[in-house]
């Protein structure tokens, strides 16, 4: 519960429901709500009045991190698979770090996995083997999963994402690990974010939208290296105009994303550090980078 102006508001971090205190009381006890309304208007404590904010402060409730789920039906942690398993081979070929592998799941049947996790989800899901990326919020609550198709999977949909709650908030990967008091890196893909410290994955190219949802003073936007992609070029131009720190990839980089750069042997952390720009410098570097 938190205070805004003269009103108190309630927000459930489990189901995502939010309302003011009056509506909450009305749902719980209609008769008590009538008394509540009378008292507020009698004292002048109405959202439509010039009532002075109360002198006392209501402390914000403290929410501690919960323990993450350790067991999932129809899935196993990748780190527990035998060394020759094709999912392990896939991760090894993509140069996934051991810290990355520890956070990922494997399911031989993504449909069964999703059906058990969120019954009656209503999505059409293929019953194929997938590498599963769990999404958590800042309290370690599971808020979604994304299944990445593997070598022997149906490639109709490379990624299939499923929410585990009814919230309409944007799914952002890595919010359980990010420290907003330090520089926050924002990339497109969840896998790419795992190669960098204090980094989140937007799940798409809408990095500006994601940046606005993260309450951090220092942020850097790291778009994929696609100088011929008109959409990416436009989004990067917008980010520069909004004075964000933006990575402008140097000409020597031919790969599209961070994972591909790692596989090619590049020191991605140093490249990002040396090629982060803002303002006029970013604009000049951007003009030299784009190809459309």
Mark where each language-model region is:
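N-terminal single-stranded DNA-binding subdomain of primase/primase-helicase replication proteins
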Residues: 1-27, 120-127
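TOPRIM fold recognition
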Residues: 8-16, 20, 155, 181-184, ...
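TOPRIM metal-binding catalytic domain and adjacent DNA-binding surface shared by DnaG-type primases
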Residues: 28-131, 139, 178, 242, ...
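A generic structural signal for secondary-structure junctions
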Residues: 29-30, 142, 263-266
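Generic secondary-structure boundary/loop-capping signal
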Residues: 48, 78, 142, 156-159, ...
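Phosphate-handling DNA/RNA-contact segment within nucleic-acid enzymes
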Residues: 111-218, 231-233
